Amino acid sequence: MKHLRITYAIVCLAWLTCACQDNTKFHQYQPVKQTGWHSIDTLTFHLPSKMDSGEYDMQIGIRHTEKYAYQDIWLEMTCTCDSTMFAKDTLHLYLATKNGEWSGRGIGGLIQSIHAQAKPLPLQPTEQGYIIRITHLMNDSTLQGIHDIGVQLSPRH
């Protein structure tokens, strides 16, 4: 009976370990200048050149302070390979509810929200790698309160 309990515990532990595995292939944040995020400032993410081909689920992370004056943010995301643009998207992300409460969580005055994108990002093998560029499309030419922007890619199942 004791042997059965130990076997059961090992199987449960192995299952939990597999269930908690993170299959993220790329996860990086780029800081925004302390003077604000200017509309001409582009955040650049260089993906590893040896990423497996296939479709990737993408999440955009935004870290901001309460100084950010808007409930949402408009971003333009482009993905290039060998200086050829093959993906471009406009992202409309909500950072606060209609009541003005921040959607994300945080500590120390920094709020983080994660936004899953509906469209997968298709990648093929390449020697040079891919570059993702993100700029903001807000009417305000300089945004205050945005701390950094992140990109996370995981293989789509």
Residue ranges: model-predicted function:
Residues 124-140, 145-155:
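Internal, hydrophobic beta-strand segments that form the core of beta-sheet-rich folds
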Residues 16-19:
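C-terminal motif of bacterial Sec signal peptides marking the signal peptidase cleavage site
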Residues 60-67:
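Short amphipathic, basic-aromatic surface patches that mediate peripheral association
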Residues 1-8:
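Bacterial N-terminal signal peptides that target proteins for export
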Residues 28-50:
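Post-signal peptide N-terminal segment of mature Sec-exported envelope proteins
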Residues 42, 91-95, 103-119:
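A beta-strand/beta-hairpin structural motif
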Residues 69-75, 145-147:
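Short coil-to-beta strand junction motifs in C2/discoidin
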